[in-house]
Amino acid sequence: MSDTINLTRRGFLKVSGSGVAVAATLSPIASANAQKAPADAGRTTLQYPATQVSVAKNLKANEPVSFTYPDTSSPCVAVKLGSPVPGGVGPNNDIVAYSVLCTHMGCPTSYDKSSKTFKCPCHFTEFDAEKAGQMICGQATENLPRVLLRYDEASDALTAVGVDGLIYGRQANVI
């Protein structure tokens, strides 16, 4: 007695097609019964710390004040520009803050009082302090990260509460 099966091409296609049809029929039933993962599965939401930067009355026009935010390895600067700007806070809506790390290669920028820009000495990128850190010229492809400030009229305190944009060299601003 021989244990071999004589299968023709036509027979093979019929058996294979039947198997595919059964799998296609059962697949939606199995996926309907599968447990759905929550929409935010695998995501972690980290809160920015609230850190007092300065008191508004202590800031002088075009005199940058250094601080670190959201942690001690992130140098930032707050500047009173002297005229109201979009996103500005304080009694005259003229106080802004930025990370000083250039978004191109992470070199520290410096504030230029005459042009109200942040200039990177490494590759000559310039960022406009009056226009939300917008890149004016140079190698960077992103604006300078803006530190979000909250102003409390009662205490005149300026508090950093977040960052708009990714600080150079990070996958997330809060670590």
Swiss-Prot record:
SUPFAM superfamilies recorded: ISP domain
Cofactor requirement: [2Fe-2S] cluster
Residues in Rieske domain copies: 62-158
Modification after translation (UniProt): Predicted to be exported by the Tat system. The position of the signal peptide cleavage has not been experimentally proven.
Domain of life: Bacteria
Catalytic reactions on record: 2 oxidized [azurin] + arsenite + H2O = 2 reduced [azurin] + arsenate + 3 H(+)
Signal peptide range: 1-32
Listed GO CC annotations: membrane
Sorted UniProt keywords: 2Fe-2S, Disulfide bond, Iron, Iron-sulfur, Metal-binding, Oxidoreductase, Signal
Cofactor notes: Binds 1 [2Fe-2S] cluster per subunit.
Job description of the protein: Involved in the detoxification of arsenic. Oxidizes As(III)O3(3-) (arsenite) to the somewhat less toxic As(V)O4(3-) (arsenate).
Name of the protein: Arsenite oxidase subunit AioB
Organism per entry: Alcaligenes faecalis
Gene expressing this chain: aioB
